[in-house]
Amino acid sequence: MEAIFSYRIFIFSWDLIRFAKLVIYYDCTNYFFELEQADGLKQYGASKENRPLPIVQMGLFMDSDGVPLAFSVNPGNTNEQTTMVPLEKKLVEDFSLSRLVVCTDAGLSALSNRKYNSKGNRGFITTQSIKKLKGFLKEWCLDSKDWHLKDSLQKYDISELDEEKDSDKIFYKERWINENGLEQHLIVSYSIKYRDYLRYVRSGQINRAQNLITNNPKEIDHNRQTDFKRFVKKNSVTPEGELAEQSFLELNEDVIRKEEQYDGFYAVCTNLEDDASAIIEVNKQRWQIEECFRIMKSEFKARPVYLHRDDRIKAHFMICFLSLILYRYLDKQLGSKYSCEKLLRGLKDMNFLKIEGRGFLPTYAKTEFTDDLEKAFGINTSMQIVTIEKMRNICHQTKE
């Protein structure tokens, strides 16, 4: 049902947006309900917000221009790794795609998904956790030698880089690996700027951890893998090696040191033979699908959901999906000049007062946004009065 809806929108929008069909992106997110009873699509499942409420799961495909292509709505307790292939099959069938590269994050890169997209003319690009690689591959990734720059055969030792001159450069290394019967192209990048960013983020988390130790030690028992509390440990032994009368909290220096060794490194796996830098660039565009979810949740108020029936829940997300397509179209027509918030606010402010027998009087102030909008779509509604005939023509224009 969801994929068919996407297909119809795709056909109607073909003349409006040139869909990039070679590379598509897939991701999942959850939407919570202000209800406590789980039934139908509403089920208790893993939630990033950690709210004790039922959720539904949405899977979304997007093209390389950030335009959504298809979505599915699944029960909140569904394993998200199983949701991609069924929707992808429907997408390929509806859009008659003959060649496809699917880009995902590590959480959706199950071996079965990688193998599926290694058949025929399909391909995959997925982020790869260096920490989860086999020991010898992990050592190879972190080895300071045999790195190179884009379009260069010169070898570099990243332990000898100039902090200032090389701060904006991205270094690469690559090799083919065979994991569980699947040949994959492992690509690793290293950047001083990315290293410094990770250190900055961790520094803030360490400060929060130290503050927790000092001011709120009772909160230590509630932590997650990416929580700053992972840097805190309980200790029952004094620095002198004696058993303490009472356990105490301190920073876990071992965890901090282990994480530091990965600073600046980023890895992807793919079955493509393309240039490493090109593949990394494709993977970087995943931020657009994360932005799609953020826009739906914040600007389109897709959550919390207050609906009970499954058919109405699906209808709710169809409306959000259609709104997202229209927003992407408007954004591209305006040259991505305005944030989503400003664009929506500008549209909401464009109101008219109907004057019987004469037409419509604009009640909004003429701004740079309204000028850009009128120029992009070849309309003019900021005149003193828009006649009834003129408004009919404008409305007809939007349906062509």
Annotate each PLM feature.
Residues M1-E400:
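Anion-binding and metal-coordination hotspots
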